[in-house]
């Protein structure tokens, strides 16, 4: 029995006990490892960085999915960038009012390995008839597609390796171009305590592009460093200020059962701490 040492940060990190190595492969794009941990269940890492675990993935996937879709209220077409483990797809597919889901993943091996070794993440969602799975670079897709979407979810790795381009100015501009009127973009943005410069960079990308931009957060044990931020860009300022009762009605009407998300958490997630507000040059959470 050995340990897996994450290598994301210099001088600070986390270690996972590997009860059993389930799969290890160097794909065309990255080094993929899936192993069994006694506390977190099955764990996937890419290029030395923990990506997802069976124990707490529900927090991340529910918050990146249900917040924008329920805020929008009438999303028919959803685009997922990344998300090869299938967890984001599983949560989007729970919204029966969504008519079309396009998922763009750069690494086909990640999809196939997660189907085999992390089947609970996708829970059969890869067989959903609404899905169009595209194996391609996410940046290239949003830069060239003629399709439009109501919600775009960027479920990227950290801004290193294949995921680096998904934090570029060109990526945010291309996503904005792909949104229908009234569309929403959300992206994974790391833990601000450890990756504050990344949050600042994203704020600079969003400001000027979107009528309303902000961040929201959730605490996910696997992603060390405190609460994780998700970037929010909307073409309609009202989405972030929806009354609690409206969200309750939409959530109840969806019939979706969650383990983390609820309308109260939805609203509270947009309340950022002072150091993050200061970093992104916002005077308040308004």
From Swiss-Prot:
Binding residues for spermidine: 61, 85, 155-158
Residue sites binding S-methyl-5'-thioadenosine per the record: 30, 105, 137-138, 162
GO biological process, one term: spermidine biosynthetic process
Single GO molecular function: spermidine synthase activity
Pathway: Amine and polyamine biosynthesis; spermidine biosynthesis; spermidine from putrescine: step 1/1
Catalytic residues in the record: 155 (proton acceptor)
A Pfam family assignment: Spermine_synth
Domain PABS as annotated: residue spans: 1-235
InterPro entries membership: PABS (IPR030374), PABS_CS (IPR030373), SAM-dependent_MTases_sf (IPR029063), Spermi_synthase (IPR001045), Spermidine_synt_N (IPR035246), Spermidine_synt_N_sf (IPR037163)
Protein name per UniProt: Polyamine aminopropyltransferase
Native organism: Pseudomonas syringae pv. tomato (strain ATCC BAA-871 / DC3000)
